[in-house]
Amino acid sequence: WHAATVVTQIECDPDDPAFKNPTKPIGPFYTEEQAKEFMAEDPSKVFVEDSGRGWRRVVASPDPKKIVEADSILNLLDNEFIVIACGGGGIPVVRDYENKGCYKGVPAVIDKDLGGELLAEDCDADVLFLLTAVEHVAINFGKPNQEELEDLTADEAERLADEGQFGKGSMEPKVRAAIKFARSRKGRTCIIGALDKAAETMA
């Protein structure tokens, strides 16, 4: 077996409502004065105050619709390559129909869990592993009544996510990706576990 890394473009819908509500912080921190100066120079750029640490630019996080290089990835797998793809979620692109339908990059961030879920679907995987810093998904995380969850149906997971039981920028995206994968085809399972116990998780 050989390993290959594929720089991956992810097609998004240019009309995704996320583009009107940028939420993903990127780049360095700035002072309020600097941030307002940047926004005055280019009104398309949005900066917000970030947890008392300064101001950062925020961009959209649209839903991934298609992996542009999916055929290349599958061809590599068929030829016994270990493929590294969708790094960081992938590069967000949209169709530019004013330029023969070519792809063009957009200022956005693809959620890496949803990007990985789409890749798992394209590879016709039966199981998706999402590895993180904790061993279990939990409700009431970090509280005295924290409860670690072992097995959930997609409906149960969705109910808990809708109740706000999971961290918005940490566990909730993983749970949402797990739900999407489990519902994409009968018999599919997603396992969320600790990176340092990946071998045990996959056993």
Which residue ranges define each predicted feature?
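C-terminal catalytic "cap/lid" subdomain
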Residues: 1-203
